[in-house]
């Protein structure tokens, strides 16, 4: 991505083509320019591989004629990936790539992770052996909920660590039993590897002639559009379904009657529909807060949901007595998956392919930061479209084929909040990505 400005300048006529939708997002524009550069490089390599002429003439007539179509397909397809909205997009410049994660740790490179959960107020107030004189009742930090102090302030369920005395500090390092407490860091790596998808189509010259004569359509162009649209749709659904599969179960026990299920009849405590829908909104906020607590990156800010749940979220504002709570959500299964912004913060996306029945409502709340590196899942395109045109050796009828290469990679911190879990390679494990929380919604009406 370091050369994206150079790529954008080179591909400016394509990026700003008047017949194509404008790319308003600067990062989408940068990624598209890198992918266009990858596409051109791949096409040149294919030309050289397939040429049967002298080495000085690296041109393949069956491939070079298709470069403009490929460039056009890439330009139209790449900005429309849903991964830009619900995940991060990091283009690859080679078939494999490495993601590095640095973790701060207590004591040694294999110690517990620091700077993730609450800082240990006791760690720097004692020596490496764990002893210090501080004049207070405790030298160890314990507990996570200060509300227990109201029940029994002296019970010791919530304690703090404090600084050591001057005498103890002066004695640090004077012998092996009085060493400084120590910290370290570890560098861990994850590997993302490009995988492939491939489709082909065949047609006859007679079909191409008749289609052109009767409908004015080019058979090769239409089939190329069909194949590329199918590949794009499959990638979109893979990203969405991977997030569904890998998201943690939301609505934990204690928040709701049944863990993972928000029942509007038993959990919202509302008297009528809008009050129940507001209970649903509050539960969604709790899942968003849980993402912040689990990742220490930020509250959840994106929602993927079924159409009826989105409509319920809309009604919670539209049907309320306060017009200021109008959420301006546009719910349409047949149109754009982006429905609108909820409460000025959540971007709501409708999944038009999810089962929209009384027993199958759900929502997934996730977090995606302003930086492309701040997400729970990354889509890593390498070569978006490779097109090959051939002729059947027996029938002499034309054939075309498409291939694409990309990787899916989970955030290295998505499953390793304490730093002790194994390094993640690939999209990660089911029910383990803490950047996303998945909840079933029952008794919506």
Question: In which residue ranges do the predicted regions lie?
Answer:
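Sequence/fold signature of self-assembling virion shell proteins
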Residues: 68, 77, 83-85, 159-161, ...
């Amino acid at each position: 991505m370091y050369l994206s400005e150079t790529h954008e300048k080179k591909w400016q006529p394509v990026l700003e083509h008047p017949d194509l939708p404008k790319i308003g997002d600067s990062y989408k524009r940068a990624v598209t320019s890198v992918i266009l550069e990858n596409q051109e490089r791949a096409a040149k390599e294919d030309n050289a591989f397939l040429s049967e002429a002298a080495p000085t003439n690296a041109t393949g007539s069956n491939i070079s004629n298709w470069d403009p179509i490929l460039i056009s397909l890439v330009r139209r397809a790449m900005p429309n990936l849903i991964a830009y909205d619900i995940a991060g997009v990091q283009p690859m410049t080679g078939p494999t790539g490495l993601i590095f994660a640095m973790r701060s740790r207590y004591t040694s490179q294999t110690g517990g992770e620091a700077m993730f959960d609450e800082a240990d107020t006791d760690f720097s107030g004692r020596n490496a052996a764990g002893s210090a004189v501080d004049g207070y009742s405790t030298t160890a930090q314990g507990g996570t909920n200060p509300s227990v102090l109201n029940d029994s302030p002296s019970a010791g369920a919530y304690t703090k660590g404090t600084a050591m005395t001057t005498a103890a500090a002066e004695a640090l390092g004077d012998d092996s039993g009085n060493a400084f407490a120590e910290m370290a860091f570890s560098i861990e790596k994850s590997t993302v590897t490009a995988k492939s998808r491939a489709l082909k189509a065949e047609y006859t010259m007679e079909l191409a002639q008749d289609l052109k004569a009767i409908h004015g359509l080019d058979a090769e162009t239409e089939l190329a559009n069909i194949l590329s649209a199918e590949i794009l749709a499959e990638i979109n659904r893979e990203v969405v379904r991977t997030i569904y599969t890998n998201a943690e179960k939301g609505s934990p026990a204690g928040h709701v009657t049944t863990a993972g299920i928000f029942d509007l009849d038993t959990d919202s405590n509302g008297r009528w529909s809008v009050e129940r829908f507001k209970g649903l909104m509050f539960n969604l906020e709790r899942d968003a807060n849980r993402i912040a607590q689990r990742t220490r990156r930020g509250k959840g800010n994106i929602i993927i949901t079924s159409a009826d749940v989105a409509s319920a979220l809309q009604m919670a504002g539209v049907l309320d007595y306060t017009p200021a709570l109008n959420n301006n959500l546009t719910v349409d299964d047949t149109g754009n998956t982006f429905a609108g912004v909820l409460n000025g913060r959540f971007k709501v996306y409708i999944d038009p392919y999810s089962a929209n029945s009384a027993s199958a409502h759900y929502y997934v709340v996730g977090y995606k930061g302003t930086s492309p590196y701040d997400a729970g899942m990354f889509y890593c395109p390498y070569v978006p479209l490779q097109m090959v045109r051939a002729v059947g050796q027996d029938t002499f009828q034309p054939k075309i084929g498409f291939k694409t290469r990309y990787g899916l990679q989970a955030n290295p911190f998505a499953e390793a909040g304490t730093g002790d879990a194994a390094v993640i390679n690939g999209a990660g494990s089911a029910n383990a990505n803490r950047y996303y929380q998945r909840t079933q919604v029952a008794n919506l009406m």
